[in-house]
């Protein structure tokens, strides 16, 4: 029988302060994803800290399925899900974590720099990526505004919902999707940045996380939500009156995952399960694109006409410094001009 699971949510600055008060010195790092997971489960507990959107995939699907395997027998989970940047900062401050899953690599780099995650986390299986998605445009049923691309967000009189990029990793993906799509149309970097500014200027609210942004949209805020494809699929599966559009030019979203230094064997076993065919099929069932290309159903997950990656802009370390640094980033300057908080 599966042990009781403790679910905790740590969000915002208060979460970091609370985490710092803990006397638990959590070491964090990345064990080899190719290590054997044979034999019977050793029990124990896995502390999962993740970004907001895959919470129910973990609690309702991945963890129960893992518990049914020989390696997962007797393993219990303590879970914390929230805005990716907030979660990463909380772990750095002392929140217990043996497996971390963030929405963008910059949040993992923070823990590498803190000595909590091994530097070679991205040299593991599937380059340390748990699952894929793409940035999409979620609209009201029937798409009354005729939204087809990121250009429409720039040119049409619509209200946009996207999270705050200084707490949410998904917001950073959204912004780079807009920026990259403009470059791919032949616009200059300044014109692409102007497009980002125009879209952000149409946001009446910037929630703290991708999941909070979806909630705001389904509760009636805004005309268009920029979101992960899996969030749109989730909303439809739950009966929400929405449609979604995959823009012809959009970004491939890749979310990093790693076990922490000195994490228990159960954490590595769970990560191995996440990367297994069984685990990847669970991601697919929940609207995420498997990282194993052999498991991608192209009818459910069509390939966008023009799909680009964050590497095109130099990777997340460069992007975070150029665009999202709180003091000198290009997007920080835009948000400050709009009166939006850039405090991490």
Feature map (PLM): residue ranges:
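N-terminal segment of the mature folded domain
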Residues: 38-167, 306-309
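A bilobed periplasmic-binding-protein/Venus flytrap-type ligand-binding module shared by bacterial periplasmic
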Residues: 135-143, 252-267, 282-286, 291
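Bacterial signal peptide processing site
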Residues: 31-34
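Ligand-binding pocket segment of bilobal, Venus flytrap-like solute-binding proteins
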Residues: 185-250, 256
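Extracellular/periplasmic juxtamembrane helices and adjacent flexible linkers that interface
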Residues: 2-6, 12-15, 264-344
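C-terminal motif of bacterial Sec signal peptides marking the signal peptidase cleavage site
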Residues: 24-29
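Ligand-binding cleft/hinge of the Venus flytrap
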Residues: 64-71, 154-208
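Short beta-strand->loop
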Residues: 120-130, 150-151, 236-251, 259
């Amino acid at each position: 029988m599966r042990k009781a699971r403790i679910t905790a949510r740590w969000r915002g600055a208060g979460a970091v302060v609370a985490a710092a008060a803990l006397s638990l010195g959590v070491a964090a790092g990345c064990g080899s994803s190719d290590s054997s997971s044979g034999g019977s489960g050793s029990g124990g507990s896995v502390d999962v800290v993740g970004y907001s959107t895959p919470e129910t995939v973990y609690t309702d699907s991945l963890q129960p399925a893992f518990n049914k395997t020989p390696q997962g027998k007797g393993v219990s989970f303590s879970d914390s899900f929230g805005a990716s940047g907030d979660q990463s900062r909380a772990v750095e401050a002392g929140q217990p974590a043996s497996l971390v899953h963030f929405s963008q690599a910059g949040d993992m780099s923070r823990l590498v720099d803190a000595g909590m995650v091994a530097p070679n986390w991205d040299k593991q299986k599937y380059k340390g990526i748990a699952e894929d998605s793409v940035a999409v445009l979620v609209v009201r049923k029937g798409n009354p505004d005729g939204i087809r691309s990121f250009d429409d967000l720039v040119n049409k009189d619509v209200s946009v919902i996207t999270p705050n990029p200084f707490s949410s990793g998904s917001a950073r993906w959204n912004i780079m999707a807009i920026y990259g799509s403009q470059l791919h149309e032949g616009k200059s970097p300044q014109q692409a940045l102007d497009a980002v500014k125009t879209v952000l200027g149409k946001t009446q609210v910037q929630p703290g996380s991708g999941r909070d942004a979806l909630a705001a949209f389904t509760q009636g805020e805004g005309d268009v939500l920029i979101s992960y494809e899996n969030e749109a699929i989730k909303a439809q599966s739950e009966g929400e009156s929405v449609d979604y559009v995959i823009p012809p030019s959009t970004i491939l979203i890749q979310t990093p995952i790693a076990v922490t230094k000195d994490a228990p064997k159960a954490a590595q076993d769970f990560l191995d399960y996440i990367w297994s065919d069984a685990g990847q099929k669970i991601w697919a069932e929940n609207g995420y694109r498997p990282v194993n290309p052999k498991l991608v159903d192209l009818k459910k997950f069509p390939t966008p006409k023009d799909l680009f990656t964050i590497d095109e802009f130099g990777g997340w370390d460069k992007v975070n410094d150029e665009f999202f640094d709180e003091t000198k980033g290009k997007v920080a300057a835009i948000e400050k001009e709009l009166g939006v908080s850039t405090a991490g």
